[in-house]
Every structure is written in C-alpha cells, then in structure tokens.
C-alpha cells in the first residue's frame, strides 16, 4: 500500500483590530443667571387681535389625507376641540383648506 501524504491546511483567522473610540466627555451643566430681569406683560387687546380660535366641528375620518394632515397640523385632535392660534397667512391658508370642518372665531 502506498501511503498518501495528506496535506492539512490550517486557516489562520486574524482578528480585526478594535476601533478605538474617543472617551466620552462628561456633560457639563450651564447655569443661567438672570439679573435685573423685567417682565413685560402683553395686554389682552393685542393678543386678541393677533389670534384666531378654531373649533373642529366635523370628523376628519374618511376625508382626504391632505385634509387630515392639515387638521393635525392645526393641532386639532377631536370634535369640539378648540385651539387658539396666531393669525398668520400660513394658518389662514390651512383654515381655508379645511373650512368645511371648522368653526372659526376671530
């Protein structure tokens, strides 16, 4: 019998070097010191002129997805939910889009 020379292959697995991470810095706290602060109170007349009250009167379920998103964007969550928002052209445009679902009070 002829003995065959068997070649055994050894696979050497090299480990990848670990990535060194920078040490985590401790979060430092900032102290805010207010000296001689004056509080400015807004009058009710100025806040009433610049705001609009909207009430969700009808359900937005079953409506167009863009109309649903507009209602959520206005911050309304359920029927008879009232929200007071600043009276800006952006808000007015959103109100006009879904006016059939809302009651608006200036």
Swiss-Prot record:
Molecular function as annotated in GO: structural constituent of ribosome
Source domain of life: Bacteria
CDD domains with a match to the protein in the record: Ribosomal_L30
UniProt keyword annotations, A-Z: Ribonucleoprotein, Ribosomal protein
GO BP, sorted A to Z: translation
InterPro entries per record: Ribo_uL30_ferredoxin-like_sf, Ribosomal_uL30_bac-type, Ribosomal_uL30_ferredoxin-like
Quaternary data: Part of the 50S ribosomal subunit.
PANTHER family per UniProt: LARGE RIBOSOMAL SUBUNIT PROTEIN UL30M (PTHR15892:SF2), MITOCHONDRIAL RIBOSOMAL PROTEIN L30 (PTHR15892)
The protein, known as: Large ribosomal subunit protein uL30
Organism: Ruthia magnifica subsp. Calyptogena magnifica
